[in-house]
A protein has these predicted regions:
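N-terminal active-site segment of His-dependent metallophosphoesterases
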Residues: 1-68
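Extended active-site neighborhood of metal-dependent phosphoesterases/phosphodiesterases
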Residues: 2-3, 30, 66-156
């Protein structure tokens, strides 16, 4: 076994926070979503104690789809909660954030260039890469695969 003298580090993965408009009850069949905002605030506090070097959010930051009128407001609320995380946060979109894959059985509206731009306005790029302690991390946007959108090809360049 090689003698590697690189110090170990930890990072955090969070997903499906489903932040909802303040004071609005959700109509989803899953009652657990009614506590989404309270739950992510607790996660933010727990992350401060865990002290990861960075956080990766795997998507579904917000509950409303980008086609809904309250999407921008809820994205701003989400960012106000996430700014309590004192470490770099790398965001990846989920179907609630940019729309669903182009398949008939998908529950959300299909991903589109308009939805991608709305997401980027709040959370930045939908794919990318970063380095930490000599490790190269690559983040991809799976929702655009087989979509025919230009971003599908762009992320592979």
């Amino acid at each position: 076994m090689p003698d590697i003298k690189v110090p170990m580090f930890s990072f955090a993965i969070i997903a499906d926070t489903h932040i909802m408009p303040a004071g609005v009850s959700d109509t989803a069949p899953y009652k657990v979503l009614n506590k989404a905002n309270q739950r992510i605030r607790k996660v933010v506090e727990d992350l401060k104690v865990q002290d990861p070097k960075f956080v990766v959010h795997l998507g579904d930051m917000v509950r409303p789809f980008p086609a809904l009128s309250n999407y921008d407001d809820v994205c701003r609320l989400a960012l106000s909660i996430f700014e309590g995380i004192p470490f770099p946060v790398h965001y990846l979109p989920g179907n609630h954030d940019i729309g669903d894959k182009h398949i008939a059985s998908a529950p959300a509206p299909q991903v589109s260039d308009i939805f991608l731009e709305k997401y980027k306005k709040h959370f930045g790029p939908t794919f990318g890469a970063f380095d930490h302690q000599g490790i190269h991390f690559i983040t991809l946007n799976a929702s655009v695969i087989n979509s025919g959108l230009s971003e599908e090809a762009d992320q592979w360049v």
